[in-house]
Amino acid sequence: MNKNNRTLLAALIALSLIAGFATYFISPDLNKTVAQGKGEGVTTKFDSTIQLTQEGTENSTITHNRINNAQFPIDKSQFKRAPEFAETNGYINTAPIKLADLREKVVLVNFWTYTCINWIRTIPYLVDWNEKYANKGLVIVGVHTPEFEFEKNTDNVKAAVDKFGLRYPIVQDNNKETWNAYENRYWPRIYLVDSGGDIRYDHIGEGGYAETEKVIQSLLQERAAQMDKDASLLKFDNANKTAIPNGVQSVDFSQIKTPELYFGYQFARKPLGNTEGHKANQTVTYTFSPSDIKSNIIYLDGKWKNNAENMELESETGRIALVYSAKSVNIIAGGNGEEISVSEGGKLLSGTSGGPDLSEEGKFLIDGQRLYTLSMHDGYGNRSLILDVKGKGFQAYAFSFG
C-alpha cells in the first residue's frame, strides 16, 4: 500500500471513529442507564445525552455537546413530550402555572402526597436541589395527588408544605388529571423535563439521588449550551459526588419485613386478624386474645366503624395491636384531640426509641389528619406494638414502616 493510500485509509478510520462516537453521544437508546433496587425505587427511563459511561469507570460529564469543536444536534425523536399540567384544584407557593410557561427551564416534576413516608424521606434531597439549582435554571414543581380524601383539603396540604419547608411551586391534582396524563401509578415519582419540554429521566420511588442530581446538572449544562452560554461556567461543587443533606433517614429495605398495612375495607390488602373481619359501613365490636396475635396483621379491640378508607372508633376507648418487623413505624391517623398511648413489649415507648410525635410519657394527641411517627429504633427487629386510644372519633388509616 503506498503512502497516499495509507494516509487516505487512516483518515477514513478516524472519521468512522468520530461518527461512531457521535452516534453514541446523541442516541437515547445507546446511552441509557436503567437502575433499580428493592424498595429503593426504579429508574424506568433515563437518558443523559451529555454523560458517557464506560464499564468499570465513573460517569464522566461532557461540559459541551461538542466533539472536536463540531456541533452535533441531539436526536429527540425518541423522547416523550412532557404532558401539560391538567385540570388543577389549586396552587401553593405560586400563581397559576403551566409547564408551557417553563420552557427554557429544566423542570423536575415530583408526584407526591403528604402522608406518604416514602415521599417524606425524599424531602431533604428535594429541598437541597431547590436551594442549589433554582438560580441556575431548575424549577421543581410538586404535583400533589392525594391518596386519601382528606388530602384533597387545601389547608391540610398547605400545613404540610409549611411543616416540611417546601419553597417551590405546588399544584393540587385532586382528580388525578395530571397523574393520569403522565400515566403515573406511584408515590413518589420524579420526571426530569429538559428545557425543550421533553422527558429525559423518570425515577419511581426512593433512592437514585446521586444519579438524579447528575442528570439535573447535565440538563442544566445542556440548557446553557443551547442558549449559547458557556456551559463550562456552570460549575458544580459536587460534580463527582452527591452530599447527603441534613435530615435524611437511612433505610435498609431488605430489613423491613412488614408491608404497608391499611385499615379501611376498600384499601385493605390483608384481612384483619379479628375473626369478625371487615364489614363495610358497619359498626363492629372487636375483641382479640394476645395469644392469637400473628405477625404483620392488624388486630382491633373496641367498637369500630368500618369506613372505606379508615377504621373509626365508636366507643370511648379502643386498642390496636400489631407485631411488626422494622426499625420504625408510622400511622396515618385523624380525629380531634384523642389521646393515644404507645407501648412496645409491654412498656410505654420513651427516650430515643420513641418517635418525634410522642411525649416523654409515650403518648400523643391527634392534632390533624397526617402521618405520626411512633417509634424510631437504632436497629431492625421484631416488635409488639400496642396503641391504646382514648376518645371517640379517632380514625386509623394505615401503618407504614422504615
Regions found by a protein language model. Give the residues of each.
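Non-globular targeting/processing and membrane-anchoring segments
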Residues: 2-90, 213-402
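Short active-site neighborhood of thiol/selenol oxidoreductases, capturing the structured segment around
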Residues: 96-120, 126, 139-141
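Thiol/disulfide oxidoreductase modules built on the thioredoxin-like
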Residues: 162-166, 172-215, 374-379
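A short beta-strand-turn-helix
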Residues: 84-107, 133
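Structural recognition of the beta-strand scaffold that forms the well-ordered cores
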Residues: 107-110, 139-143, 169-172, 191-192
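Sec-exported extracytoplasmic/periplasmic mature domains
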Residues: 87-90, 121, 128-135, 162-165, ...
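Active-site-proximal beta-strand/loop segments in catalytic clefts of secreted hydrolases
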Residues: 111-113, 143-146, 173-174, 203-206
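Structural microenvironment flanking redox-active thiols in thiol-disulfide oxidoreductases
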Residues: 120-163, 172-178
